[in-house]
A protein has these predicted regions:
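Structural/interface elements that position substrates and couple domains in central-metabolism enzymes
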Residues: 1-424
Length: 424
């Protein structure tokens, strides 16, 4: 297959697939496929509900077409799969979306085709889990009739600076020739350059440790924040002082959620356990980060008690629900842990987040965010997500939402140290 002969399809048009499809659509013909008809209809009308891409950006992708029809995939010969890889209720990898996408592609596979995976997985998943599905439903043989590549996504939702094209891309292939083809394909759109890995397993491992390393580093800072808070020392001041040394890593405490950093370590841990090794640090980091919602709720209740604010039936406003700032994604947000804990104390909790897509919080968590918080109504306010709207409000506007003796708990350093009552 020559470069000019590639007929490209992107499978899954979410936070990863859509920006990728748009970039390729500026260079070559691309078919964007998603099983969600509502999503395809919105994109055809120039609207991206994730707000990652504007209508103008979508319109500049002249060669991109959208479909939900699997028959359209038969006209393609190179498929990039970008579906989610979540975990189940027991924190075990859930490969079902990936395997179903593989089955869909397999039914369209022809001799000479290439299937590239971008979804984050544990090392070995592409060749050990996905390839058998491709072989079974296509009737073709791996590395004889069809070939595979792996190029892990590095999307950073809500970040308008680091985009698909200016983030260096890891590439790999199931044969040396396939690896070169995959690398050349991505070079069409990646201005930051590519890194051709030695194997698919190397590329898979590289991706999963990127997020595992970040998770562990945040866990360390979260633990330090708990210790420093007990000593009455401001964590941000300590981090700023330590950061004056050139090799100190600039991590901040906080809730760790979303579909990457809070999930991927479990994939690596799962594989480690499958080969007979119990990972200590990886799972310890996960436990600590998952406990932060309970910690925040407990600290707030203690502060309210000290101020003689009656906890039961207290009205509490949580500002922000998405897993990170300036992003619509509520999947695996750990803000819900705070909501759950406070409701255990019979607090009346309102959640306010202008970024949340209507109906999604109710669908995932049974939470209905309020449209606008009422001034002077709350006994406590938690600034949980650093949306630009919240930063621009300033301390007076935020405090005016509370009663006279209300407590402001700033989890994200949106306010100065002296402007809040509690911080991480």
């Amino acid at each position: 297959m020559q470069q000019n002969d590639i007929q490209l399809a992107i499978i899954g048009l979410g936070y990863v697939g859509l920006p990728l499809a748009v970039e390729f659509g500026r260079k070559r013909k691309v078919l964007g496929f998603d099983i969600r008809k509502e999503r395809i209809d919105q994109l055809k009308n120039g609207y991206d509900q994730t707000l990652e891409l504007t209508q103008e950006e979508l319109q500049t992708s002249f060669n991109l077409t959208y479909t939900t029809d699997t028959e359209d995939l038969r006209h393609c010969n190179c498929y990039i799969i970008t579906v989610p890889t979540p975990i189940d209720a027991h924190n075990r990898p859930n490969l079902q979306p990936l395997l179903l996408a593989s089955e869909t592609v397999a039914r369209a596979l022809k001799p000479g085709d290439i299937v590239i995976y971008e979804s984050t997985v544990y090392p070995g998943a592409t060749e050990e889990d996905c390839v058998p599905v491709l072989e079974t439903f296509s009737g073709l043989k791996f590395n004889q009739d069809f070939f595979c590549g792996y190029s892990p996504e590095r999307i950073n939702p809500g970040d308008k600076t680091h985009r698909v094209n200016n983030i260096k891309k890891i590439t790999s292939g199931s044969t040396p020739e396939t690896a070169q083809r995959v690398d050349r394909l991505y070079q069409e759109i990646i201005t930051a350059g590519t890194h051709l890995a030695e194997s698919i397993k190397v590329a898979e491992a590289a991706k999963v440790i990127e997020n595992t390393q970040r998770d562990i580093n945040i866990a360390l800072i979260n633990e330090l924040a708990i210790i420093l808070n007990r000593m009455g020392i401001d964590t941000e001041a300590v981090l700023n002082a330590a950061g004056s040394k050139w090799n100190f890593l600039p991590f901040r405490p906080g809730l760790v959620g979303g579909h990457c950093v809070g999930v991927d370590p479990y994939y690596l841990a799962h594989k480690a356990q499958a080969i007979g090794y119990h990972p200590e640090i990886i799972l310890a980091g996960r436990r600590l980060n998952n406990s932060m919602g309970s910690h925040v709720a407990a600290q707030l209740v203690i502060a309210m008690t000290k101020r003689r604010i009656h906890v039961e039936n207290a009205r509490i406003l949580i500002m922000g629900l998405t897993f990170k700032e300036n992003c619509t994604d509520v999947r695996n947000t750990r803000v819900v842990d705070i909501v759950t804990e406070l409701k255990q104390f019979n607090c009346k909790v309102d959640v306010y987040d202008p970024w949340v897509i209507e109906g999604e919080a109710q669908l995932y968590y049974g939470i209905s965010p309020i449209a606008d918080p009422s001034p002077g109504s709350y006994d406590a306010i938690i600034v949980a997500v650093a949306h630009d709207q919240f930063k621009s409000m300033g301390v007076n506007a935020i405090r005016n939402l509370g009663k006279t003796e209300s407590i402001v708990y700033d989890l994200k350093y949106v306010l100065c140290a002296e402007e809040s009552d509690l911080r991480l």
